[in-house]
Amino acid sequence: MLLLFGASISWLDANTGAAGHPRSPLSVGQQAPDFITSDTHGNMVALKEYHGRPVVLNFWATWCAPCRQEMSTLQAVYTAHQDKGLVILAISLDAAESPDEVRAHITSLGVTFPPLLDPQGSVAAHYNIFLLPSTIFIHPAGTVAAMHIGPMNRAQVEKHLVAIMPQQG
């Protein structure tokens, strides 16, 4: 119980701006905040590298059971749509896990899209993430098309993808 309370306080701290004022909420239609963070190999990755492509940001942690369960759904969607340019970035909020441990964990789940690291929660703070899993769907133009808090099934993910995937015609 104390651990959960401490984690909640940490999330509160990460999601407040100067002098403890809450950050502005992220909303659909808004430009997605750019960020730079590292992958599990130490390479720096910026959201702007994916401008022009549909992007799914999934905030998760190895200790989050619903996050782990959702990974197979996200992998199935990625496999089905990666040839159409879909990018999924799994942003790990694990502060206590090493990059190697995060990589091993996501590999054990059968995930092939890249895990990124956000151990201090700075990327999560830009996106006002305070519950896991949370997923942001970003249109190729760089705007937020949809947001989902909590685990998703395949139908839910596919419903949100309609707003960001190129239309076949």
Model-predicted segments: where are they?
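N-terminal targeting signals for export/organelle localization
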Residues: 1-31, 169
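Short active-site neighborhood of thiol/selenol oxidoreductases, capturing the structured segment around
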Residues: 45-68
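Thiol/disulfide oxidoreductase modules built on the thioredoxin-like
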Residues: 104-112, 117-168
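Active-site acidic short loop of glycosyltransferases
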Residues: 51-53, 83, 111-112, 129
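Short, ordered coil/turn segments that flank beta-strands lining enzyme active or ligand-binding pockets
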Residues: 40, 50, 140
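Structural microenvironment flanking redox-active thiols in thiol-disulfide oxidoreductases
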Residues: 68-109, 119-126
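Hydrophobic beta-strand core positions in alpha/beta domains
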Residues: 56-58, 90-92, 137
